[in-house]
Amino acid sequence: MTRLPLSRRRFMATSAGAALIAGASGLASPLRAAEPIKTAGIYTVPVEQQWVSRIHKAALTAQERGDVEYVYSENVSNTDYARVMREYAEQGYKLIIGEVFAVEQEAREVAADYPDIAFLMGSSFKQDEALANFAVFDNYIQDASYLSGIIAGAMTKSANIGMVGGFPIPEVNRLMHAFMAGAREMNPEIKFQVSFIGSWFDPPKAKETAFAMIEGGADMLYAERFGVSDAAKEKGVLAIGNVIDTQADYPETVVASAIWHFEPTLDAAIAAVNAGTFTAADYGVYSFMKEGGSSLAPLGTFEGKVPEAAMALVAEREAAIKAGTFSVEINDEEPKSS
């Protein structure tokens, strides 16, 4: 990807709630709660891309409250990522957020050189206690994905669902498996076509892959990537959204969406930085539905069109998930076509 110049879009915010990991040893010299935290986002894709857009949205919300002064760089290549991290660190930013799935080691090496700066990074790996200023997160929205799968299983007539993903990494795999488990609640014999396009942002390729699945009999698509819902719309089949709600753009196509809310994750990090307790931790828990980190989007134009039995099961399971009496399996293995 082409590296863009550092964008400086500043925003102001207020304090975020109780601190994460109270009493834990964290970064030295905590900032005053009233002082906005200088925060930088580093993204390898445009901020319009669905996954990154949720991080960006949460940062914008925090800036509006006065919690942070926020700037960001988008379309940063993997080869430039560590350099951009260093640039922000040298400029005095106190909280750096982003996604390091392709630069895991390099990002940690940078963080080790700046022990007084908090790094909160999307990662396929867990935290390392030896690197106290580097916390990780991921979009553990398997709860909402499972519920959207129940709806998909009830709406497919061909019992054939196409699933297009970016890469077969844990944060994608677990959502696909949860979706498949939900669909099988309605029909254990559903067939799944699974494919990965090898890119986080290539709508034309995702669209062509989806077309092939429709030709293979799929009448319902799982849109893990942009471009899939376009194919569904053109061919007159249905789709389930992922991470963001795109029904406004596809009112006759997208039945439901599993939504990721990054606000609980970022707010916990902001509180920890303010309290001086930020340390190596796995912030992935804040994406769980019971933490407010994920939800099922309203059915909107499909209200009343999903079979009642499916919606009754969705309501039952959603209540149980929030109460902690039902757990959706987290399966990070690569899903396969059936």
Task: Pin down the residues of each PLM region.
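Periplasmic-binding protein-like
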Residues: 93-100, 120-122, 216-226, 242
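Extracytoplasmic "Venus flytrap"
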Residues: 38-65, 71-80, 101, 168-174
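Flexible loop/hinge segments that line or gate small-molecule binding clefts
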Residues: 112-138, 243-253
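Short beta-strand elements at the ligand-binding edges of bilobed clamshell
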Residues: 128-151, 163-168, 251-264
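An alpha-beta-alpha
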Residues: 59, 145-187, 194, 282-304
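Hinge/cleft segment of the Venus flytrap/periplasmic-binding protein
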Residues: 275-338
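N-terminal secretory signal peptides and thylakoid transit peptides that target proteins
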Residues: 2-22, 29
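C-terminal segment of N-terminal export signals and the immediately downstream linker at the start
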Residues: 27-42
